[in-house]
């Protein structure tokens, strides 16, 4: 593999994981904030709010996992390497 392609792949893999985690991280923080506020306002709805929160966390975390998969493909099965 060419050294420039290798270096670009490593940088791209790092960016894929790093940038792929920023959005879900911010989203999880704001979702948790909303859930805590909702539970504080209506303690009797805690179970329903918690279930919805955990489901939304799973969907948000899948975006981070997609970034990780892209990074692993770039590092170990690089389609750009000749």
Curated annotation (Swiss-Prot):
Keyword Ribosomal protein belongs to the record: no
Compartment list: Cellular thylakoid membrane
Keywords attached to this entry: ATP synthesis, CF(0), Hydrogen ion transport, Ion transport, Lipid-binding, Membrane, Thylakoid, Transmembrane, Transmembrane helix, Transport
A GO molecular-function annotation: lipid binding
Gene Ontology CC, one term: proton-transporting ATP synthase complex
Bilayer topology annotation: Multi-pass membrane protein
TM regions (residue ranges): 7-27, 57-77
Major localisation: membrane
Keyword Transcription: no
Domain of life: Bacteria
One Pfam family of this chain: ATP-synt_C
NCBIfam families for the chain: ATP_synt_c (TIGR01260), PRK07354.1 (NF005608)
Family note: Belongs to the ATPase C chain family.
Protein name according to UniProt: ATP synthase subunit c
Organism: Prochlorococcus marinus (strain MIT 9211)
Lineage: Bacteria, Bacillati, Cyanobacteriota, Cyanophyceae, Synechococcales
């Amino acid at each position: 593999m060419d050294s420039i392609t290798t270096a670009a792949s490593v940088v791209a893999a790092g960016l894929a994981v790093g940038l792929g985690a920023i959005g879900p991280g911010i989203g999880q923080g704001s979702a948790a904030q909303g859930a805590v506020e909702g539970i504080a306002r209506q303690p009797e709805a805690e179970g329903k709010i918690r279930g919805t929160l955990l489901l939304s966390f799973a969907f948000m975390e899948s975006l981070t996992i997609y970034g990780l998969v892209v990074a692993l493909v770039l590092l170990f099965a690089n389609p750009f390497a000749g």
